[in-house]
Amino acid sequence: MDITASFLQDLVENKKAVPKIFSKTTLSNETSAKLFPYQKNHVLNLISILLKYFLVLDTSDTGVGKTYMAAAACRELGRKPIIVCPKTLIPNWASVLEFYGVKYYDIVNYETLKNEKTYKDSNFRVRKRCPYIKKVDNDGDYLKPAFEWKVPRNAIIIFDESHRCKDPSTENGKLLMSSKQLIQQNIPVMLLSATICESYSDMKIPFYLMNFIPHTRNFNEFVRTLKTKYPEYRVRNRQLDQAERKIAVENAQTLIIFKEIKEYTSRIRIRDLGNQFPDNQWCAQQFLSDDSDKIAEAYEEIAELMRELEEKKTQCKNHLAKIQKLKQEIELRKIPIFIEQTQLYLEQGKSVIIFVNYINTMNILSAQLNIKCRICGDQTQDQRQESIALFQANIEKIIICQIRAGGVGISLHDLHGGHPRVTLLNFPDSASDLLQALGRAPRSGAKSPVLQRIILVANVEYEKNIMRSINKKLANISAINDGDLEGHKYQVNEGRRRQRRVLNEPVNNPIEEPVNDPVKDPVEDLTDNQPNIVEV
């Protein structure tokens, strides 16, 4: 074959491989018919941003259908996705892509991909070497990526739950950072997360991918230039005390981020959808407890252990384990409230979703309430899907979930009508985990309203302090996503309790060691596990 013929053949193959789409103002009839009305403009926004920057952040609220809209964008762009997501979400991605008729190159979880592996077939059990990525020895050169990508030209890479990749020092963070080489090759990268950022420093990797900074190490220097760029957000009030000034500075920083990244983001807010989305009432609710004094004492002990950790005292090597045991004890002492409130809502014809942190709490509640549907870290995918199916079909009226196992990527909304959902939740350490858990019941397509309650114990000041701390982080998320400091705040209400029933005393059960807690998945590089318990 001569040079001219070879050149022409390359042109033909490249034309087939890379879709030539320069703008998009309407969706195809096939795609449009499968989207809710409020999703259509968002899909067009995703496509427009990808065509301009080859990078987009979808920060839409949990439950509006980010998976479906990402798949729709792939279809409209004519690209075959490589999906990187938590393992529990793999079957959902496969079914959604099939729904849109989108063929994919790969669907793989973070841990498998970081080890240069993927799955052999659609059963997602047996692994093989991944042809699209390999680890790179950068010889101590921090400017070199930790992974090298080699993907087809018509691919699109989607990082689902991308808030798991916000720390540049973790393997997850390095994996996401390495995707910049794809963006530079005009291969689109999509990040999906309703909680991409809880604090200013969480934006290091997004800023790097957006080419604002040459490396995440340049983040602080870039931040100083933003203060000059946005003088309207300088904190000038000299009468603020130290705590007030800290809050004001953080608020200003998050609003600056909102301004800086808005060209790269698209977002659907539930509160803008009106009656297109199920009514969702939520608050943190206080309940009286006979064990409030013991719970307060446990928090005092946690606060003291935290202070000793901050002071780096030599004898505190077991403090983190002690803190976990105390947190579990506090959750166990809330069991009577969970039982009473669950029975109350069942009598009202509601279906109840319970979120807790520890497997021991889950086991006791399951026995007391005869719960058959469970979502936890030590079950198979088939067991997990069976529990979801029984609850979604309204065969079972209660489902109980560990927050880290059941707070992401599952839908528990009322599909058929007449079975309104109630969520009862013990708050987790992370504001992101809280938002994710509270997004399981209010989903697009739900047929009934949702009531959600974060369980607090009255007369325990530490619980209210924790809620204030969580609200601050939620305000950061809201400000970065929407430029609104009030978007995700939970009101603290007083709750009423019935006459106490005679229940087995939960705190006599053995305390779990934190190393056996399946809520924690060390391979997924989850962050923000140890907040300051006394922060206000």
Curated annotation (Swiss-Prot):
Its EC number is 3.6.4.13. Transmembrane segments: none annotated. It is an enzyme of class 3 (hydrolase). GO terms for biological process: DNA repair; replication fork processing. Residues 288-334 form a coiled coil. Pfam families: Helicase_C, ResIII. It catalyses: ATP + H2O = ADP + phosphate + H(+). PANTHER family: DNA ANNEALING HELICASE AND ENDONUCLEASE ZRANB3 FAMILY MEMBER, SWI_SNF-RELATED MATRIX-ASSOCIATED ACTIN-DEPENDENT REGULATOR OF CHROMATIN SUBFAMILY A-LIKE PROTEIN 1. This is Putative ATP-dependent RNA helicase L364. It comes from Acanthamoeba polyphaga mimivirus (APMV).
